[in-house]
Amino acid sequence: MGRGKVQLKRIENKINRQVTFSKRRNGLLKKAHEISVLCDAEVAAIVFSPKGKLYEYATDSRMDKILERYERYSYAEKALISAESESEGNWCHEYRKLKAKIETIQKCHKHLMGEDLESLNLKELQQLEQQLESSLKHIISRKSHLMLESISELQKKERSLQEENKALQKELVERQKNVRGQQQVGQWDQTQVQAQAQAQPQAQTSSSSSSMLRDQQALLPPQNICYPPVMMGERNDAAAAAAVAAQGQVQLRIGGLPPWMLSHLNA
């Protein structure tokens, strides 16, 4: 027959109780070590003897860390449960606080706008005045700072525009010099062309005039011919004969001239 179920109860005999404690304690610590090694679990076992003596086991002797982890998980779970139970009551309290804060802010805003001042006493009005003066000083200071920054930025732009203007003026002067030089060169070329155009007709006129003068001189009788001395009667006859001969020579020469020269001579 099999063994019956053993009833667990306190051992009355002190000696037997001490022996059983020693056996079961060693078995418990051994089992804790086995489960820690086999299952890679963090195990902590704390045992106090009937006389108050401490026996313990901890994985890798890290009892403090295991207990700290236990407390963190235990208290976190308790805090979550308590927070859920208290949150419902806290919502109403938070709502009342936020509502009162909103009302206070709205009231201060009205006071700053100059509204609902009847409920304020002299001291509160003085505090409000000081607050407004302080705010006004901050506003003026901020405004002045922004204006100075704007002026500085405008001055920088002005200097940049002045430098750009100087560069453009310099470029314009250079271009004007180039244009004037080109105009002077063009005028000089035009003057040379006009001078050459005027010189050609004058040369043609002078050449034609000189040729006509040479022709006219060729037609005139020679003045340096020496005639022998003759008597009075003979002189008249000789002069008449010479005139007739010269006229004949002139007519012969004129007959050999071109028509345009004949018209010039007749004129």
From Swiss-Prot:
Q: Which positions fall inside the K-box domain?
A: 88-178
Q: Does the keyword Transcription regulation apply?
A: yes
Sequence ranges assigned to domain MADS-box in this UniProt record: 1-61
GO annotations of cellular component type: nucleus
Q: Where is this region: Disordered?
A: 179-215
Record's subcellular location? Nucleus
Q: Does the keyword Metal-binding apply?
A: no
Subunit-level organization? May interact with the K-box of MADS1 and MADS6.
Task: Relate the protein's function as given in its record.
Answer: Probable transcription factor.
Name this protein carries in UniProt: MADS-box transcription factor 15
Q: Which organism is it from?
A: Oryza sativa subsp. japonica
